[in-house]
Amino acid sequence: MVGTTLKMRGDENASENFKQVQLKKLTVPSMEATTKRAALGDLQNRGISRPIAAKDAAQKDSKDLKLTDALRNAKARVDSHWKKQPLGSTNGNGNGAVPPKVNEGGVSAFLRSNSVRNRVPTKTTVEPTKVTVKSSSSENVNEPTLKREDSNLSKKSLTKLRAALAKPVMGVSGIRREPVAVSRKEAETKKELPETKKDSLEVKKDATRMPLIRGNSAVTTTTSTMPTTMSLSSKRLAGIEDIDANDKENLVLVSEYVNDIYDYLYQVELEQPIHKDHLAGQKEVSHKMRAVLIDWINEVHLQFHLAAETFQLAVAIIDRYLQVVKDTKRTYLQLVGVTALFIATKYEELFPPAIGDFVFITDDTYTARQIRQMELQIFKAIDCNLSRPLPIHFLRRYSKAAGAEDEHHTMSKYFIELASVDYEMATYRPSEIAAASLFLSLHLLNGNHRAGTGFNDRHWTPTLTFYSRYSAAHLRPITRLIAKLARDAPQAKLKAIYNKYQGSKFQKIALRTELTGALMDSIVGQSQRK
C-alpha cells in the first residue's frame, strides 16, 4: 500500500508558497501504512490512564510523553465510515457482539481530526442497561372487565346475602373430626458392597421390589421407578391398568413420577383438614350464612369467567379462615368471601380481575383498602399456605383412570360444586368428594337410570380402586349425600350452581333426566326423602 497524502484546500488568505516541510508532516510513510493499525478507542485507552475533568483538555501541557508516544503512529480512519449496527447484528470481527454505549471525554475529543471527531468513539466505557417491559392499556390483551350495564349480578343477590346476614344466629354444635394420622417409612440407605457380592445384591433388589398397595391412608413409596412398579403391580393385582403407559413421550404429563406427586397431594390434604362442625365456635356466623356466601361467590365466579380451581380454592380459603378465626363478625363475612376469591384469582388465573371489580361486586360496601387489609389477615390465619389440594385435581386423575367421557367429567364437576355449598360435606377430604362424585356419575350415565337398582360396585373398577385408594364401600355414604343434593337442587333456595349448569357451556348437565330417575331415588334411599 502506497503512502497516502492528505490534500489540503487553502482559503483566499492562504499563502501560495506552501512549505515543503509542512507537506511532509501531513504525509504518512508507506512503510508505516503496511503495519497493523490499532483502533482509536483501544489506542487512546492505553494512552490515557486517567480522565481529565477539572482542566480543559485543549490547554493540557504538550509535554505529556506518554500521550505523545501513543498518538505518534496513529492514523485517522477517514477512509472508513462507521455505521451503527442494528440490535442482534454482528460486528466486523464476526463475534456477534452488540456495540456498547460509549461516552466520549477527556483529551481524545480534541486530538482527533475534524472529519472523525463526531463519529469515532474514543474512551469506551460500557454502561449497563436495563430492559423494562411497560404494560400499557393499549395492549391486545382481553382481560375480563366488568361493566355495570353488562353485569348479571342484580341487587337481588346482594339483598339475599344481606338478609341472611341480618337473621338471628343459629347455634352450630358438633364433634370435631380428628385428622387421621399419617405414617410413612423412611427410605433405607443402601450400603455399597464389594464387587464379589454384586450378584447377590441384584437378587435381593429384585426380591424387595413390592407393589404399591394403596388404601385409605397414606402409602409407602418405593425407590424403584414408576414403570417397574406398575409392571410388578399389574402382575400381582389382576385387572389394574397402567393409565400412564402411553404418556412417556409427553413430558407435560410427567408419567415417570406422577404417582409420587399424588402421594404428596394425599399427604397434604391430611395435614390441612377441615374439621367436622368447624363453625361451632363462631358467635355470629352460622352454616346458613356460609351457604349463602358460597352460592353468591359461585355467581361472581361465573360472571368473571374464572377457572374451576379458582372457585374451589376460594371455598377452601373461607373454611380454613373461619375454622381458625372464631370471632368473625357478621358484617365482615362478605368481605372474607370476596377477599378469598380475590386471593384465589391471583393464585390460579392468568389475568386476574382488578381489585376495583371486587369492590364493585360488593356494591361499594367495602373499599379496596379493606380488601387488602383482610387479605393480610387471611394469610396470617392460614399461615400463608395455599397448597391444599382441590377436588378438581383428583377428579382429573380419576376420570383418566375410569376412561370417562366429557359428560362424566362435567357431571362430576357439577356434583363437586353442589357439595361445596353444603356444610356437612365440608369435612370430607377433596379426594373423597372427587371419587364419590365420579362414582355417582358412572352410576347414572353407564347404568339404567330408569331402574331402581341402587348401588352397583362394578362401576368402581380395580383400576379406580388402585388410583383413588378408596373402595366402593367407603364411597357409598358420601355418594348418597351428594345424590341427595343433586336430586333436591331444582327445589333448593340457593340455585346459582343449578342455574349455572343449565347452560350449553356445561352441556346442560343440570337438566339431564338421569338426575331425577328411579336410580337416583334408589341411591338416595326412601328414608331420606322429604
UniProtKB/Swiss-Prot annotation:
PTM sites of type Phosphoserine: 137
Span list, region Disordered: 76-152
Entry keywords, A to Z: Cell cycle, Cell division, Cyclin, Mitosis, Phosphoprotein
Pfam families for the chain: Cyclin_C, Cyclin_N
Any one Gene Ontology BP term: mitotic chromosome movement towards spindle pole
GO cellular component, one term: chromosome, centromeric region
MF term (GO), any: cyclin-dependent protein serine/threonine kinase regulator activity
SUPFAM superfamilies the record matches: Cyclin-like (SSF47954)
Classification via Gene3D superfamilies: Cyclin-like
Compositionally skewed regions (Low complexity) per UniProt: 121-144
Subunit structure: Interacts with the protein kinase Cdk1 to form a serine/threonine kinase holoenzyme complex also known as maturation promoting factor (MPF). The cyclin subunit imparts substrate specificity to the complex.
PANTHER family per the UniProt record, alphabetical: CYCLINS (PTHR10177)
Family of the protein in this entry: Belongs to the cyclin family. Cyclin AB subfamily.
Designated name of the protein: G2/mitotic-specific cyclin-B
Source species of the chain: Drosophila melanogaster (Fruit fly)
